[in-house]
Amino acid sequence: MNEPATRIPFGDTPPTRCAFYRRVCDLPAHIDPPELGRIVVRAEHIAALVMPSALGHAVHADLRRCHRHDAVPAIGPVLAHPRSGRWTFLIRPDLPDDTALFTEMFRLDISIARPGATLALPSPTDRGEHFRRWLHLPHNPFRPSGLTVLDSLRACTARTGWLRTPATGPRP
């Protein structure tokens, strides 16, 4: 199965990119602040899991593998943040509001962006691809269940023995 193209089909300005995010991806994006052209979305009907890129790569591969064996798509929009070495998986907001889950994710260096959080999306005003870029561009309103991504994440950490990376030292 071919992956969708990772380019934005409309012009490359913040207003046209926002229009693409709103119309095609059902992401209520807006420009904030207007003079900088940064595109953000308030997580209302979406949530996100933000994790180290090495773990994100493993989760993405696991979700692709699951998708090949299942009729239900498992991969939704995924963002890379190259400067910070993080990946963001946009998901449905169906993760439980549970202290044990937050503790588990904290130990793995994973953040849960719950409804109400502000998420920055790739913008044509970003300088190169050093800030944010799409690894898996949304081409429709689909976002996987947070529980599906969480299951994949748990499978990957169990297989690899993943632990929180140290805050000091060089970043990949």
Question: Where do the language-model regions lie?
Answer:
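Signature for HUH/AEP ssDNA processing cores
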Residues: M1-S84, P93-L95, L135, H139-P172
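Residues in well-ordered beta-strands of folded domains
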Residues: V50-P52, L79, L90, S111-A113, ...
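Beta-rich nucleic-acid/ligand-interaction surfaces
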Residues: R86-T88
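Helical (often loop-to-helix) elements that flank the catalytic cores of nucleotide-handling enzymes
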Residues: I91-P115
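A recognition module on extended beta-rich or small alphabeta surfaces enriched in W/G with H and D/E
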Residues: A113-P144
